[in-house]
């Protein structure tokens, strides 16, 4: 009888323990499972980094000369030098030998243009001679008085030993002939927010962005590397004519295409697109 009672109690104990080997009820005391499996492995979940705020690399140029270092006065009777450049020749071998330009065209390039290498040497030379770039609006002011509206020369405050210089770029429209004779083709805003030059290698026909071979971008880089060459961030001024557009974009009207010409609609659409494209530049 005792043996039967012991066997009966053992069977009841086994039946009590068996549910613990099966699936827990939703309302049971199941252990918590992390929602993100990576947490269980001790891994840190991926987090998208916040984009870094844009830092203007030329801010250091604009703030290089503090007011207490501008101890030299340059009055209205003293000369402010001026250098002007046409677009520079990025590929001189192509321009003067390989592009098929006529002899008179080559003479014209030699008379009115400089190569990118010559331009770089000129910048280095005026820098070493103590010149500093100034903004033309700091040199001249427009005033209105009893005699009317006119321009007056200002007195500049310069670092000791420096001489003021204005650089200007003429045309800056990148004529169609320039695209065939070894020049860059336009200015664009790069993904970094800075100005780049678009260029097509005349030998390989590869189009790319560069800061070499263009007067504007080369000066940007030179000033960035020599912040003491600029007063308050001054660089150059553009003397735009609007002839064949500006900055490499064909924004100009064409009076040879009549208003009622079938070609006018396509021309106006392209012109509007070019106007929008140049605005960020």
PLM regions: where:
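N-terminal low-complexity, Pro/Thr/Ser-rich intrinsically disordered segments
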Residues: 33-81
